[in-house]
């Protein structure tokens, strides 16, 4: 509401203060908040920190559920998506957020990204089920390499020598982590063959997850540019479109016999598991929003690198809350992976600070893949 009072209306004569001891100065006019909200929405550092916290929460909650004999992974993911949809719908009803209403044509165009998301989160849950949190986070670094070269192919990115060196450190840390994991499995008491087989299954799921994650991140970045989706639009369509697919996959591919349900939800831990599932579902609200937010205000490579910089607190959570082996090779792998993240950050800073000479573009270049994507959206 506009304040029409003149400046002299706010003046106070000092000799009249004693006559009106109860005088209260009028409140200052409200300050516009649009610029502040815009600066927060486009703050790259804040988006990275938000993604860090949400990814740590989601990883720990998922590991808690999957660390038992839980094998209803599709059901877990469906609960997460359902809780996410309920949460953002309540926020929209309260006027806290806004996003587009459901549109069938937009849903059809976004559905391939949803399938990539389902592939990413399912393979990630399977890898986390077989691997410890430190090993899982270290191997997640390999996704950064795939995404970086994907950006070279589709978004005109480049890889410097220092960036390439950081990639070498990431691969080296993954090798150390795998060797430490296998060494601990062989030397520990119990069936070593069974433990090594479990680790091998985890490595295979991790490889598939790296491919799915890089495809999802690159595809989502390109699709966001073409559809002009905002952060909550992306979160809404990602979770809403994934629910029917996850329900069908859970009903067809997972065992819903009474014995298996009792094994997944034992009476002693049933309440704790259900609470963790709901909490992990709420964490998907933050991970869905902050991941899209981070990709929008930074780049898909920076988004993937956040996971590498997160490895230290995530690994510590695995060592504190779960039975992850604490050995010199495993700690060394964590530290090498963390150093690789620092080297990568320095490489990106130097690359961004270097002036681009000799390049005078008159138009925005469009690759053949980008043009074909735009043509498909028009159809």
UniProtKB/Swiss-Prot annotation:
Membrane topology: Multi-pass membrane protein
This protein's name: GDP-mannose transporter 1
Keyword set, alphabetical order: Cytoplasmic vesicle, Endoplasmic reticulum, Golgi apparatus, Membrane, Sugar transport, Transmembrane, Transmembrane helix, Transport
Ranges of the Cytoplasmic topological domain: 1-39, 91-110, 157-162, 220-233, 294-301, 347-379
Region (Disordered) location: 17-38
GO MF entries: antiporter activity; GDP-mannose transmembrane transporter activity
Lumenal topological segments: 61-69, 134-136, 183-198, 255-272, 323-325
Keyword Membrane in record: yes
GO cellular component, one term: Golgi membrane
Organism: Emericella nidulans (strain FGSC A4 / ATCC 38163 / CBS 112.46 / NRRL 194 / M139) (Aspergillus nidulans)
GO BP annotations listed: establishment or maintenance of cell polarity; GDP-mannose transmembrane transport
Entry's transmembrane regions: 40-60, 70-90, 111-133, 137-156, 163-182, 199-219, 234-254, 273-293, 302-322, 326-346
Function (record text): Involved in the import of GDP-mannose from the cytoplasm into the Golgi lumen.
Location in the cell: Golgi apparatus membrane; Cytoplasmic vesicle membrane; Endoplasmic reticulum membrane
Quaternary structure note: Homooligomer.
Annotated family: Belongs to the TPT transporter family. SLC35D subfamily.
Highest taxon of the lineage: Eukaryota
């Amino acid at each position: 509401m506009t304040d029409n009072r003149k400046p002299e209306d706010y003046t106070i004569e000092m000799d009249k203060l004693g006559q009106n001891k109860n005088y209260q100065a009028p409140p200052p006019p409200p300050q516009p908040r649009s610029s502040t909200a815009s600066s927060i929405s486009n703050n790259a550092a804040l988006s990275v920190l938000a993604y860090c916290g949400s990814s740590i929460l989601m990883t720990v909650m998922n590991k808690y559920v999957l660390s038992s004999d839980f094998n209803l992974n599709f059901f877990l993911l469906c609960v997460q998506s359902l809780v996410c949809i309920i949460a953002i719908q309540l926020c929209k009803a309260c006027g806290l957020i806004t996003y587009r209403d459901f549109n069938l044509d937009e849903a059809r165009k976004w559905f391939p990204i949803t399938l990539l998301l389902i592939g990413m989160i399912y393979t990630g849950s399977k890898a986390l089920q077989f691997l410890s949190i430190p090993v899982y986070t270290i191997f997640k670094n390999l996704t950064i390499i795939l995404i970086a070269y994907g950006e070279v192919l589709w978004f005109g990115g480049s890889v410097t020598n220092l960036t390439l060196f950081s990639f070498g450190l990431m691969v080296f840390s993954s090798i150390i982590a795998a060797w430490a994991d296998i060494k601990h499995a062989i030397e520990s008491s119990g069936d070593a063959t069974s433990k090594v087989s479990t680790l091998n299954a985890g490595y295979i799921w991790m490889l598939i997850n790296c491919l799915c994650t890089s495809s999802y991140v690159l595809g989502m970045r390109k699709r966001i540019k073409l559809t002009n989706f905002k952060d909550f639009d992306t979160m809404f369509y990602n979770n809403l479109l994934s629910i029917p697919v996850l329900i069908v996959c859970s009903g067809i591919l997972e065992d819903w016999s009474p014995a298996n349900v009792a094994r997944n939800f034992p009476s002693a831990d049933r309440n704790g598991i259900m609470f963790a599932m709901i909490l992990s579902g709420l964490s998907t609200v933050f991970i869905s929003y902050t991941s899209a937010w981070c990709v929008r205000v930074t780049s898909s490579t920076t988004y993937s690198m956040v996971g590498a910089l997160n490895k230290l607190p995530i690994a510590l959570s695995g060592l504190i809350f779960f039975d992850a082996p604490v050995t010199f090779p495993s700690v060394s792998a964590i530290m090498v992976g963390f150093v690789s993240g620092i080297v990568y950050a320095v490489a990106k800073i130097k690359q961004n600070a270097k002036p681009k000479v000799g390049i005078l573009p008159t138009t925005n270049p469009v690759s053949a893949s980008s043009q074909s994507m735009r043509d498909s959206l028009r159809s």
